[in-house]
A protein has these predicted regions:
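N-terminal capping/small domains of soluble enzymes
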Residues: 1-72, 76, 90, 106-107, ...
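Alpha-helix-loop-beta-strand connector modules within alpha/beta enzyme cores
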Residues: 12-21, 65-101, 143-173, 205-233, ...
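Hydrophobic faces of well-ordered beta-strands that scaffold small-molecule active sites
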Residues: 32-36, 53-55, 99-103, 127-129, ...
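Catalytic cores of alpha/beta
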Residues: 38-48, 109-118, 174-185, 235-255
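Active-site beta->alpha loop and helix N-cap motifs at the rims of alpha/beta catalytic domains
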Residues: 2-5, 41, 48, 52, ...
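Glycine-rich phosphate-binding active-site loops on the catalytic face of alpha/beta enzymes
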Residues: 52-64, 122-138, 188-203, 252-276
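Histidine/lysine/aspartate-rich catalytic loop segments that bind and position anionic ligands
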Residues: 129-156, 175-207
Length: 289
């Protein structure tokens, strides 16, 4: 059942979230998960019919006017920021949609079992691995792997979450990571193909092609499917910026949904505020005598 104290809304059990997502699919609808960095975003994302709302620190930076990658930098306590957004902004205004907490699993200052207990107690229905080292590569990724901040800790966080009856929806950047997340017990896997294009603070050149997007997405799905057959697959990032873009990937792969953060929250604000302000500026003024 939903919240046992109020009878409605968060927190949901893991099986209840899964049941809701399967119900969406049974209606012939794609699963839409949306990142929210403010209460007002979450409120109207729910009104639009999203299936999941994900809270992570990058949402706060987005709504400050900065690029999402700021959430990967040492500009604040990622875990505390996500918890604060959830407690004071999102959970109080979301009525029914399951709310997921972004967890920086490699944070060396926290006992992850203890932190996930707080996440659960706060009323979140699941966890997401953000900030995530799965989208870090090259020399720096090697340094992280060798100095106690390995992506292995993200797999361990997901396994802990499963033991604690928390739904898990996770980012991966490669087939190898997808297989490991499947082994850890992830319920939903997001094929992350890079920072989203478009808008005032999206990438322009640091983006993969459409062919690579589709190829990488399906390769991630195939790897996880070789481990388990009960996972939801969603696409995210890179050139996938509009409903038409998401549909293009869903039709070309085994994805059943899309995760939108910049493409929903940021682009929605950028476009609507710009256009609405322009409409107000069209008001003529004749000098009164």
């Amino acid at each position: 059942m939903p919240n046992p104290w109020t009878g409605t809304g968060n927190p949901y059990t893991r099986s209840e979230v899964i049941e809701r997502l399967n119900d969406t699919l049974s209606k012939g609808q794609a699963i839409i998960a949306a990142g929210a960095g403010t209460g007002i975003s979450a409120k109207f994302i729910e009104k639009g019919g999203a299936d999941l709302i994900i809270i992570y620190n990058s949402g706060r930076f987005r709504m400050m006017g900065h690029g999402s990658t700021a959430g990967m930098m040492a500009y604040g306590d990622a875990n505390a920021i996500a918890m604060e957004i959830g407690e004071y902004e999102v959970l109080p205004v979301v009525n029914e949609v399951p709310v997921i907490c972004g967890v920086h699993a490699t944070d060396p200052r926290r006992r992850m079992w203890h932190w996930l207990g707080k996440v659960k107690e706060m009323g979140f229905s699941g966890v997401n691995n953000f900030p995530t080292h799965t989208i870090v590569d090259g020399h720096f990724r090697g340094v992280l792997e060798e100095t106690g901040m390995s992506v292995q800790k993200e797999y361990e966080m997901v396994a802990l979450g499963r033991k604690m009856d928390l739904f898990s929806i996770v980012y991966v950047g490669s087939p190898e990571e997808a297989a490991e997340m499947a082994k850890a017990g992830a319920d939903a896997i997001i094929a992350h193909v890079g920072t989203t294009v478009g808008g005032s603070i999206g990438v322009t050149n640091a983006v993969v092609s459409w062919d690579d997007t589709i190829r990488r997405t399906q390769a991630i799905i195939d790897a996880a499917k070789s481990v388990r057959d009960d996972i939801f697959y969603l696409c995210h990032g890179g050139p996938i910026n509009t409903p038409e873009d998401a549909d293009r990937v869903i039709q070309a792969t085994d994805c059943v949904g899309f995760v939108g953060a910049s493409s929903l929250e940021r682009m929605g604000v950028e476009e609507s505020l710009t256009n609405l302000t322009r409409e107000f500026k069209k008001i003529p003024l004749e000098r009164k005598k």
